[in-house]
Curated annotation (Swiss-Prot):
Disulfide bonds join 9-78. Degraded by YMEL1 downstream of the integrated stress response (ISR). It is a multi-pass membrane protein. Its main location: mitochondrion. Residues 153-163 have a biased composition (Low complexity). InterPro entries: Tim17 (IPR005678). GO terms for biological process: positive regulation of protein processing; protein import into mitochondrial matrix. This is Mitochondrial import inner membrane translocase subunit Tim17-A. Belongs to the Tim17/Tim22/Tim23 family. Residues 147-171 are annotated as: Disordered. The gene is Timm17a.
């Protein structure tokens, strides 16, 4: 059940890692711009300088964190596809849970369980929303009536007529 074409697994990991880095850097840059602007001293010049400093300092770090998450998630997902032999939403849900657990391993088993639960629930919600959107979009374009391709099954009154007359008389 593949809705869209994706790269094969070795390249998918690199692609997802780069996409996550880009998303984290851009999103983190926007967030840090507001945060740096808000936390700077009064004055437009001070606030703009504080905003740019916050962007330069934190946006690459956030991008790197997102890249680690995306790379680990894709690696586990590709491993699940290889082991199970099929690509379905359960791979993504399990990959999200395992990614959360692995990234929280330094904080202890309680944090691992909590992060695994959050990762699994988050990915289950994302996969569920994707399935619902796919079903809703497919309901917008129902299959029309199917036409018979074999004209021998049609009665002679419904056969398409030729602009050059009735060709059956020469058979």
């Amino acid at each position: 059940m593949e809705e869209y074409a994706r790269e094969p697994c070795p390249w998918r990991i690199v692609d997802d890692c780069g996409g996550a880095f880009t998303m984290g850097t851009i999103g983190g840059g926007i967030f840090q711009a507001f945060k740096g602007f808000r936390n700077s001293p009064v004055g437009v010049n001070h606030r703009l300088r504080g905003s740019l400093t916050a962007i330069k300092t934190r946006a690459p770090q956030l991008g790197g964190s997102f890249a680690v998450w995306g790379g680990l998630f894709s690696t586990i997902d590709c491993g699940m596809v290889q082991i199970r032999g099929k690509e379905d939403p359960w791979n993504s849900i399990t990959s999200g849970a395992l990614t959360g657990a692995i990234l929280a391993a330094r904080n202890g088993p309680v944090a691992m369980v909590g992060s695994a639960a959050m990762g699994g629930i988050l990915l289950a919600l994302i996969e569920g929303a994707g399935i619902l959107l796919t079903r809703f979009a497919s309901a917008q374009f129902p299959n029309g009536p199917q036409f018979a391709e074999d004209h021998s099954q049609l009665p002679s009154s419904q056969l398409p007529s030729s602009p050059f007359g009735d060709y059956r008389q020469y058979q």
